[in-house]
Design a protein with these regions (language model features):
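FAD-binding core/adjacent interface of flavoenzyme oxidoreductases
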Residues: 1-3, 69-141, 226
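Internal hydrophobic alpha-helix adjacent to the cofactor/substrate pocket in enzyme cavities
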Residues: 17, 285-312
């Protein structure tokens, strides 16, 4: 019996689970187990909406897996022993594996005071805590730490849903820094229209009960701090003896296997996946293809074949600016911005289409195998991947 254990039911983990279940359905020599702390799927792309009190759909993981032969185990992964090939759940239960898919994602990379005095969007529960606090606040100052895409979307959403609050978007970089001049200007004008104050070139070094401390000693009052500034992987992988990078992500070979433990595949935000243009950054855009590829590779190995090289190229950066506005920067496969972009209602329609819930896609995946045609492979930008 080949035991395949998949850790994490995010975008990448769910893709791996549904694809592997589809390819091994009916086989009595393969057991697929998916482990996740919650029985519901979290759409991380919509947590900025949950964090402002908006209702988003919830999806039941065991219900989706019903009839596939895959089993679901609810619990927190507390330890992995890559040499013994075991996973400990809630410090009580131990699962043995022959092949492991590590898809546990990342958490906020914080500074002192964040754990005690700031909110994050690490989970649905975290977003609900933020929503409750914003509702009770009524008036005051909200500092959104981090000028990346999550910070921009969160600041816009908070300002639109809670017009009585003063929203400050603060970070080292300029919002929309990865965009060309026109879409970047549109994004910044939208934030200004919503009343968001932007402070670029500022770095928070500490979060206090009612303020943030900046590099250089300045203190800024804050009734609420939302931390979106950077991510890192949990220390589980490094503690397991797997090779990791400086952010705790598992270093993989070109087929998505750990460079130190080839029976471990790493996908999604928790993996440092190299392409011809560098290491992929964590997004749903690349997570689902990586999950599918891992499933296909595992199935190939079960057939006595070698796994194939994973190639992926980016194609867009969609950013919501509240419910009625958005900007989409189309990109080259290496994530450099193209000249093409969308703004306003066309951008809203485009973003809602491409970031629509993946749940129907997972439903199709558990019935029909997908392939590399499912995503752009990057052309000349990834041909050198070996």
């Amino acid at each position: 019996m080949e035991n395949v254990v998949i850790l994490g039911a995010g975008y990448a983990g769910m893709a791996a689970a549904t694809q592997l279940a589809a390819r091994t359905k009916g086989r009595d020599d393969v057991r697929v187990t998916l482990v996740n702390p919650q029985a519901t799927f979290t759409e991380r792309l919509r947590l900025h909406m949950t964090g402002t009190g908006q209702q988003v759909a919830r999806f039941d993981i065991p219900e989706l897996l019903a009839g596939t032969g895959a089993r679901f185990v609810r619990g927190w992964v507390t330890a992995v022993d890559a040499d013994a090939k075991t996973v400990r759940i809630d410090d009580e239960r131990v699962l043995h594996y022959d092949t492991l898919v590590y898809a546990l994602g990342t958490v906020a990379d914080t500074v002192p005071g964040v754990d005690d005095h700031a909110y994050t969007l690490n989970s649905f529960q975290d977003a609900e805590l933020l929503a409750d606090r914003l509702t009770r606040l009524g008036s005051g100052t909200v500092v959104v730490a981090g000028t990346g895409l999550t910070g921009v979307e969160s600041a816009a959403e908070i300002a639109e849903q809670h017009p009585g609050l003063d929203v400050v978007l603060l970070g080292r970089g300029e919002p929309g820094a990865n965009m060309r001049e026109k879409p970047r200007a549109y994004l910044q004008a939208a934030l200004e229209r919503l009343g968001v104050t932007v402070r670029a070139g500022a770095e928070i070094v500490k979060v206090l009960p009612d303020a943030v401390e900046l590099a250089g000693g300045e203190t800024m009052h804050a009734d609420v701090v939302l931390w979106t500034s950077g991510t890192r992987a949990a220390p589980l992988a490094a503690a397991a003896g797997l090779a990791t990078d400086e952010r705790g992500r598992i270093v993989t070979d070109a087929t998505l296997r750990s460079v130190t433990h080839p029976d471990v595949y790493a996908v999604g935000d928790a993996a440092a996946i190299k392409q011809g243009y560098g290491v992929m950054h964590g997004t749903c855009q690349g997570g689902m293809p990586a999950g599918v590829h891992a499933a296909v590779s595992i199935f190939r190995v079960l057939q006595g074949k070698q796994p194939k090289v994973f190639r992926f190229g980016y194609y867009h950066t969609p950013v919501s600016l509240g419910r009625g506005d958005a900007v989409v920067q189309f990109t080259h496969p290496d994530d450099r911005p193209r000249r093409l972009f969308l703004t306003g209602r066309p951008a809203v329609r485009y973003k809602e289409t491409v970031t629509a819930s993946p749940w129907p896609t997972y439903g199709r995946m558990k019935k029909l195998p997908a392939s590399g045609a499912f995503w752009p492979r990057g052309g000349r930008f990834t041909r050198g991947v070996r």
